[in-house]
Amino acid sequence: ADGLFEIPPRHFNRSLTDFEEVDDLDVNRPELFDYYLVARQIERIADHAVRIGALAEDVESGSTSGRTESDDALAELAALAEATREVVEMATTAALDASDDRAYEALERCHRSVEDGRALDRALFERAPPGAYALSRVLDSVVRTAERGGNVARVALRGGERLPVRAGEA
């Protein structure tokens, strides 16, 4: 993801000094800057995915035989992670397709995911099931991922508010 993230900043920086760069990409500077912002958020999402993957072993090693509170918390966390994945996917699609409706829906889902994550965090603190520490670390990354998805949706909305740029004004 880090290598892919370098592409939008490189093009954006070149576009500041080279007008042909913008023409070659067939986008205007504001659009290019939005792509840069989205790429930056996706890079952060990828960082959280790596962290979640690294912590997954700790979560799995904390599970025991039989149904426990930890299993219930893990199921809630898995559902939250799926909802967060949908937020990111919807927000990214909204940014690429300039869809305000999708961006607003992604923001609504983002807010719900963050609220659900905070509620689960409180429940983990109160119940303190086995493996709660590892679960809370994964939960933190899942919530931050949802927030990054919300940031992508905000970029999509901001891009939709711009007036079209006429030829020669890029």
Task: Cite the ranges covered by each PLM segment.
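Cytosolic, long alpha-helical scaffolding segments
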Residues: 1-170
